[in-house]
Each structure stands twice: as C-alpha cells, then as structure tokens.
From Swiss-Prot:
Function comment: Probably a ribosomal protein or a ribosome-associated protein.
Parts of the chain that traverse the membrane: none
GO MF annotations in UniProt: structural constituent of ribosome
Location, primary (coarse class): plastid
Biological classification of the source: Eukaryota, Rhodophyta, Bangiophyceae, Bangiales, Bangiaceae
Presence of the UniProt keyword Ribonucleoprotein in the record: yes
Subcellular location field: Plastid, Chloroplast
One Pfam family named in its UniProt record: PSRP-3_Ycf65
Name of the featured protein: Small ribosomal subunit protein cS23
Family per record: Belongs to the chloroplast-specific ribosomal protein cS23 family.
InterPro entries: PSRP-3/Ycf65_sf, Ribosomal_PSRP3/Ycf65
Gene Ontology biological process: translation
Source species: Porphyra purpurea (Red seaweed)
One GO location term (cellular component): ribonucleoprotein complex
Keywords: Chloroplast, Plastid, Ribonucleoprotein, Ribosomal protein
Length: 99
C-alpha cells in the first residue's frame, strides 16, 4: 500500500477518512473525506475506489481493510483515547483533529 495513505480526521463524534496518493516525497488527494458514523464512510470509499479502475484490486482491498481497522479502533477505543494515541496505533497514516 506504499502508493497510498489514509488521511484521518479524528473528532469526538465522527471520524473522517480520505485517501491520498503518495507522489515523490509528498501526497496528492485522491478522494474527499468520508465520514463515519454520520454516513457510511466504508461504503462510500469502496464506491469511490471502484470508480478508479487504475487502482489495483489488491490496493483497493488493502485500503478498505485499513479503513475498517481505523473505524473499528475509533468506535471501540477512540472516545477513550487521544489523537496522539491513535497516531501511535497507526503511524503509517496522516492524522489531524481534536483531543
């Protein structure tokens, strides 16, 4: 998955996830942010990735699996843990937000 990274907006009542493509030493936005639980971020992200046929299926699956991990962590642990603990749990992703 080194071609892509998740950007996570860590909020008290929601989590938002976007995907960036890694280009050189930086990133380029690939999707907008999708929110959970306000909307079904996973389903929306899946549809967005499927609309980009140039993304390999294995990359789509890996991105969706990682999205599931982040959403589950937020649901189960997020309200008890700070943004810095979430960053420590998922160091390969880009986090911003509150708490």
């Amino acid at each position: 998955m080194s071609k892509f990274t998740l950007k996570v907006l860590w909020l008290e009542n929601n989590i938002a996830i976007a995907i960036d493509q890694i280009v050189g030493n930086g990133t380029s936005p690939l999707t907008s942010y999708f929110f959970w639980p306000r909307n079904d971020a996973w389903e929306e992200l899946k549809a967005e990735l499927e609309s980009k046929p140039w993304i390999a299926e294995r990359d789509r699956i890996e991105l969706l699996n990682k999205t599931t991990e982040v959403i589950n962590y937020w649901q189960e642990e997020g309200k008890k843990h700070s943004l810095s603990k979430a960053q420590a749990r998922f160091p390969e992703f880009i986090f911003s937000g509150s708490n």
